[in-house]
A protein has these predicted regions:
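Nucleotidyltransferase catalytic core that binds NTPs
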Residues: 1-179
Length: 179
């Protein structure tokens, strides 16, 4: 019987879209954890500039990118926003497999999970100025090169759903969260 403690980890993000910075974070965390649970945040929101892709589309992007990279020990779980911070950690816990450590750079997420007794670690940052979902979405709308910032599998999913046109239509139509 082994005395080595299992460490299962949770990473929550919107992944709009999943980019190479996210992939680097997952690679690093995967080395530190037995299993990685990836929570697809704001799962109920799509078809806005800030959140153009559905939870299912993001699930496909992430799973294909990770498998192509040889990462196999992960769970993907959509997490709907409930906008009640006092019970949010319980909500997340009810949606995902058990975990011991949370990776986040969001101050509120860090506080909520710390208060609930979880070990919280900062997510490593990789070239944040380039690997930003906002920047990648802007590049898509403006016709600039965006593909070099996402795994090939993600670009293929975006192409298959005509994601660039969707974003451009959203910008032309003025659709955004809260409109």
């Amino acid at each position: 019987m082994s005395d080595v403690k299992r460490v299962d980890c949770l990473l929550i993000g919107r992944f709009q879209p999943f980019h190479l910075g996210h992939l680097e974070v997952v690679r690093k965390i995967a080395k530190e954890c037995d299993e990685l649970i990836i929570g697809i945040g704001s799962a109920q929101i799509s078809h806005t500039f800030d959140n153009p892709f559905t939870a299912g589309e993001r699930h496909l992007m992430i799973s294909r990118a990770l498998r192509a990279d040889g990462i196999k020990d992960f769970f993907l779980v959509p997490i709907v926003d409930i906008n009640q911070y006092g019970v949010w950690v319980s909500h997340v816990r009810s949606m995902v497999p058990p975990f011991e450590r949370v990776y986040t750079n969001n101050p509120l997420t860090k506080r909520l999970f710390s208060e609930a007794g979880y070990e919280v670690s900062a997510s490593p940052m990789f070239n944040r100025s380039q690997y930003s979902g906002t920047e990648i979405r802007k590049r898509m709308v403006e016709g600039d090169d965006w593909r070099k910032f996402v795994p090939n599998a993600v670009a293929e999913v975006i192409d298959s759903i005509d994601g660039v046109k969707r974003l451009r239509d959203l910008v032309q139509g003025g659709a955004d969260a809260g409109d």
